[in-house]
Amino acid sequence: MTRKLRALLGRDGVLTEADELLVYECDGLTQHKRRPRAVIFPQSTAQVAQALRILKQARVPFAPRGAGTGLSGGALTESVVVELARMRRIIELDTLNRRAVVETGLINAQLSRAAAPFKLHYVPDPSSQMTCTIGGNIAENAGGIHCLKYGMTVDHVASARVVLAGGEVVDLHAGGANAPGYDLLGVFVGSEGTFGIATEATLILTPLAPAVRTLLADFADVNDGSRAVSAIIAAGLMPSALEMMDGATIRAVEQSVFAAGLPPEAEAALLIELDGLEAGLDTEAARVESICREHGARHVRLAQDERERGKFWAARKGAFGAMGRLAPDLMLQDAVVPRSRLPEALAAIYRTGAKHNLLVANVFHAGDGNLHPYICYDARQPEEVKRVKEAGREMMEICVQVGGTITGEHGVGLDKIDYLPLIFSPDDMDAMLRVRAAFDPEGRCNPGKIIPTARTCGEARGARPRRGNAETPRSDDAERAARVDLETRQRGDAETLRHDAIATLSSSLNNDDDKAREAIDQKREATDETREAIDDGQQSEPAQSTTVFARHPFNIEAAHEALSRIVGAEHVKASPHPYFAASSRRRVEESSGGVAASSSGILASCLSVSPANQDEACEALRLATREGWAIVPAGAGTWLDAGRASLRADVILQTSRMRRIIEHEPADLVASAEAGLRLTDFNDDLKRAGQWLPLDPPDDEEASLGGIAATGMSGAQGLGYGAPRAFVIGMRVALADGRIIKAGGRVVKNVAGYDLCKLFVGSYGTLGLILELTFKLRPLPAQSSTVIACGPLSSLQRNARALLDARLFPVALELLSPLAATDVQAPIETDEDCALMIRFAGATEAVAFQLAQARAMLKHERGIRHTIVSSGDELLWRALAALPLKASEPLSWRAHLPPGKLDALLAAEDAEGVAPFPAGSRWHAGLGDGRLHVIGALPSTLSAGVKQLTRWRERTRRVGGWLIVERAPREIREAFDVWDDAGAGAFIMGRIKQQLDPSDTFSPGRFDFDS
């Protein structure tokens, strides 16, 4: 194998000598060490693919590595390290579309430096950004100082080229509204190298804010500072950064080269940064200062210039290096708690340090509750090392007890693998393992990381050498029985551990409970022994599906009776949707030669079932799966028939009766609700606290939260706020067998396990039934106003580009065709006029400035008339969102493409001289984010309709986009692929469907991954 690798990569591309390998035995967290057998240095995607094929032939596991700055042991292995440091090119810097295509060995900070001359930057900025790589950021879903306002790495990656364990090269894209199929990219980001190796990435660049204000407040008590954090967020302010250092950290920094003039007697320093337009920024800074003083700030300093601002941030980012003054060694932890629980969690963490006679310092991302306790110690003292490990474990448990998670940005890796059962049940982790098996069936990608269960030979091999001598293989039945027994025991042990730990953790917040600690230790040891047994007994095979039930003919009378016993007869109805009624009649006609009615008069069609709660929903699912019925989940039923004509439904499972708001904590900017709740009702409740969920899907105010998540669709205001995938931070989902799994959590930053939320968002009800969702929220803007400009298409396009280049930051920038403009009552004067709707929202002073600037720009363009709507401008956008549902035309489709390509696509005729749209079409386009929505009539013949759609699909593909048909007559959907091509990732999507829904219970036929 080594000879083959050297033939491919050259002698200097393969390291095998012990002294050469020493540097690769740990990452930034030196407590974990694994000496690799070899380190290889590919220089291209093709070389990575060929190298992984060589490793596959030898059945050798591997771990990808960037700069080795990780802090969880995630890039360590005793096998082969695939080092990407020699793949560091910026392949393309596309400033028009605000994208950069890079190799993943590129250093993070180098990209922002390259983009700076164009007033752009790459937002994710972890403290290690001067050395960490883009690939490492993708693997860990890195955050950084400014992710409070701008999001994590997953929010800034448009696509990734990935090499799977077998050497297959696939391009992954965000799913939902933007691309066909599941959001493979979303679940890949943060997978810590266990799904494959990202070799190239298309990254989203963000305009630099024109103005910045940076404040430094110091406090005599760290709890006062943490309470100020919650108060700032609850006041409706959205800083770009909100960081805290405690007294021990302040004193260490001030004695180092990073000294910034922080008062050494202070016990907390809060660093707050506001950015945006110059207008209104001083007012916001004054509000922040006032809040800090109200909560006990002794001094509040405003950075007077860029030099002083740089000193503040150098002190914050240099804190880790300065900690060396406190002790020879550091154990850095990473956990997240709700902002409102910061004082409680901090107090318990300091008590834990005192209990173990250890100095604990804290420097952390206070705005999102992401704690980083530094435990100071001397690694030369074995007893002290033992106390450090115990203290670190207790700190994790404290954070879980107050509603948090075990990691916000550093990842699980080796360091936190034993803590995962504290936040996820065995069923949750089983679902994660099934998704992992879809990407890597043999388990050779970075085995032994994240999930504390070894499922394959690769996992067992990578975790530790196998013990004992080779034995005579057992029969398949005996092996399967042994594995099931082991997994069952482990599931029980892990679940017991989880409940026991949570039940006893409250004592660790208030006192020392050694007996409780011993009980948890005993359970953990039992779980470890079970895991070792699985490692030693596991065969080489991927995660296997559970029971698969056969399909049976749908007996509507028997189904009606059985379901009525679960939810009540009044909540079971026949023929709720014309599409499925017609589909069912067709099936009956084909099988019996005519439309059949039952003796009770129920038309042979599907049933609609409305459970009142999760228990009823799960019982209905268990029944349906046993009987082999096809289930289609539904909220308001807005997009119930989306997808291929082969979509089949026996039972439509509606969540409309499940509409409770479960929890809303304004100080945390987080709320949870059941999936059947309407978005309008949700926002009406949130507005009382000055907050909202800023989504505007294609809808007529009926869309449910679950439906919005299931389709993943957003509207015009996605430009300024983002799509649903950016707001869903947690969910509970029922699988076909009635088991409920949890994905994510209830904190705004969470990289524990795999982000299965991304998979379910945009899955169109093909993987499970979404029961409840947790969202991160936004402060309600103080002011919103819309400019409507009317005139020739080319003039409006030119002005829209100028508005974007001027960095005025509209939350929506939508171009409307003449008919669409008429529908929303835009004041066009001729049948040729288009309309440009520009919405600004935010602080009152900022919106006034934006409006003035937009008006000034529009005045200089001949032929353009404009008006401003301030009071009630939300009605305009509501009417726009409702267009696809209110239009009488039978066809609607959407496309997504690079924004810079949209202008040409709208204006140009194709090669055959055909105009962009047929006469009578309504369309609107998001000029800032590349969305296009078209509603229109169909030609008189089927072949002409298919030809028309094919022409448009080819045009969008040529510029790097997709076209997805939302609504069309059944004949069109039978003759035309409504979803477009999911690319090489389609086979992974098919595996995911098979792993999570092996009986094909949910929405069968909606997607066709084989084609």
Region spans (language model):
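Conserved glycine-rich FAD pyrophosphate-binding loop
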Residues: 3, 8-11, 18-19, 26-38, ...
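Long, structured ligand/cofactor-binding scaffold of large enzymes
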Residues: 25-120, 137-143, 589-634, 639-663, ...
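FAD-binding subdomain of flavoenzyme oxidoreductases
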Residues: 89-96, 100-243, 444-445, 451, ...
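Acidic-enriched catalytic cores of C-N bond-cleaving enzymes acting on peptides and small amides
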Residues: 224-243, 282-301, 798-811, 848-865
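A conserved active-site cap/scaffold subdomain adjacent to cofactor or substrate pockets
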Residues: 263-292, 810-867
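Intrinsically disordered, low-complexity segments enriched in serine/proline and basic residues
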Residues: 464, 492, 501-510, 514, ...
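Short polybasic linear motifs
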Residues: 470-474, 480, 486-490, 494-498, ...
